[in-house]
Regions:
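TRNA-binding/sensing appendages of the translation machinery
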Residues: 1-3
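Conserved Radical SAM active-site core
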Residues: 6-114, 118-126, 135, 139-140, ...
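Active-site mouth loops of central-metabolism enzymes
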Residues: 64-66, 128-129, 161-164
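Short, well-ordered secondary-structure micro-motifs
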Residues: 99, 126-127, 165-166, 195
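Short, hinge-like loop/turn segments at secondary-structure boundaries
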Residues: 105-107, 131-132, 171-173
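Surface-exposed cleft-lining segments at the edges of enzyme active sites
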Residues: 123-131, 157-160
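Conserved C-terminal portion of the radical SAM core fold
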Residues: 136-194
Length: 196
């Protein structure tokens, strides 16, 4: 994931490709350019049962590389066409690019967006999440989505004991003030490869 979050639990997934969970994880990126085509095939199967799809669970749905490849947008186009529910999780204000798809989907109860906010401290965020949108940009995006009618929530993720746990209430208040109406959290979990 291009955001390069130092605490990311997904870093070891790069080992599957014989790459390092360190710098390789955020610099050797793979775009699934056929994802929309594959999704359309899966949704068309007679055995498929409609259930909300979550994008951005393992790696962010709106990485900077997404400006070029637009994989998430192509997936949203298929989901909108099929009237299929989706939830997005991101740390990037790039999600606003897809308002034209998200608003009509939200009007049908088909789309929600969650913003992961770890801290409101811009300097700390820049160290921990170097290529994710700054916390204030995420809050502005929450406001823009909410004002456009897209249901928005916030994930305080991860909560890092002794580092970001003191920010929990402030994050929830700021997100609520911006328009988030749901919240959750995830405690820090470091795979063995990251503990060192």
């Amino acid at each position: 994931c291009e955001h390069g979050c130092v605490y990311c639990f997904a870093r070891p997934s790069h080992a599957y490709l014989d790459l390092s969970p360190g710098l390789d994880f955020e610099t050797k990126l793979y775009a699934k350019t056929n994802a929309a085509e594959r999704l359309r095939i899966e949704l068309a199967k007679p055995s498929y049962r409609c259930s909300p799809i979550a994008l951005g669970i393992n790696t962010d749905a709106y990485q900077p590389i997404g400006r070029r490849y637009r994989v998430t947008r192509s997936l949203l186009e298929v989901l909108a066409e099929c009237r299929h529910p989706v939830s997005l999780i991101t740390k990037n204000a790039l999600v606003l690019r897809d308002l034209d798809l998200l608003v009509p989907m939200a009007e049908r109860g088909l789309a929600t967006v969650y913003f992961s906010v770890t801290t409101l401290d811009n300097q700390l965020a820049a160290k921990m999440e170097p290529r994710a949108s700054a916390p204030h940009a995420r809050l502005k995006a929450i406001r823009a989505l909410s004002e456009a009618g897209v249901p928005v929530g916030t994930m305080v993720a991860p909560v890092i004991p002794m580092v970001t746990d003191r920010d929990l209430e402030a994050i929830l208040e700021a997100a609520y003030d911006a328009g988030a109406r749901a919240a959750g959290y995830v405690l820090l979990r470091l795979p063995h490869e990251l503990k060192e």
